[in-house]
Amino acid sequence: MWEITVVGEVRDYSRFLLFENMLKSNYDNDVIVAISLTKSSAKLSIAVKVKKLIHTIKRLVIELILKICKEEYFVENLQIDTDDKDMQYFIILTAVMSNLEDEIDYAMVKFKFAKMVYIRSLLRFRLSRLYFLWEKFAVYFNYNMSRGIGQEIYLNFLKFLASNSRNGKDIIYLEDIDNHMILKDKSKNVLVSIPKSDEISIVVNLIIFAPNKLIINCYGVLSDKIANLIKYLFDDRVSILI
C-alpha cells in the first residue's frame, strides 16, 4: 500500500474536500482518503491499495499542489484591470491551467515522494524553477495586458491562447451527461468531466485543449453568456451546434 499525507494551510481545506470527493467518486474501492483540520493546518491523507493506480494518484496529488500554489501566485501577481469578477476568475484560472501538464511532468521527474509533503515547502525548495516560469508569465501579462484598455484586450488574450495551446486537439466533443459537461477527444475518450454549474472551468478547459474543431452536443444547456463566449473564442471552429 502506498501512502502520502499532504499538509497545507487552513484555507486549503475546501480544495482538499473537492479532491477527496473526486477520488471517492473515481477510485472508491481502491483508495482510502481522510482529511483533518487544526487551527493552523489542513491535512489530506491518502492510501492507495492497488499498485497500478499509484502513478495516477501521484500525478493527481502533484496537480492539486501545483493548482493551489499557482493560483495563489497569480492572484497576488497578475495585474488584472477589470471589475468584472467573472473575468478576473476566468483570467486566473486560464493562467493556472496554462502549461499545467508540462509542469506536472517536470514535477513528477524532479520530486521524490515522501510520506508527508508540505505544499508550499515543496514548491519553494524542490520545484522553485516553476516559480521562475510563473514570474515570466506574470511579467509578460502585466506588461501587455494591464494598461487600462478594458475587457476587449483580455478577450483577445484568451482567443490567442485558444489558438496557440501546446495541447491542441483535432476534435473536441462537448456533451451534457448526468449534470456534468464532458469533453471527449475524436476517439470519444473522456478528457475531463466538469460540473455543469462551473461554466468558467468548461471554457478554460476548451481553451487549454484548443481544438481545431469543436462539436457541441448540448445546445441550450450553456448560458447565453458562455455560449457566446465560446463562439467568439473559437469562431468558425465551432462547426456543429446541435
Segment roles from a protein language model:
Residues D185-I242:
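C-terminal structured domains
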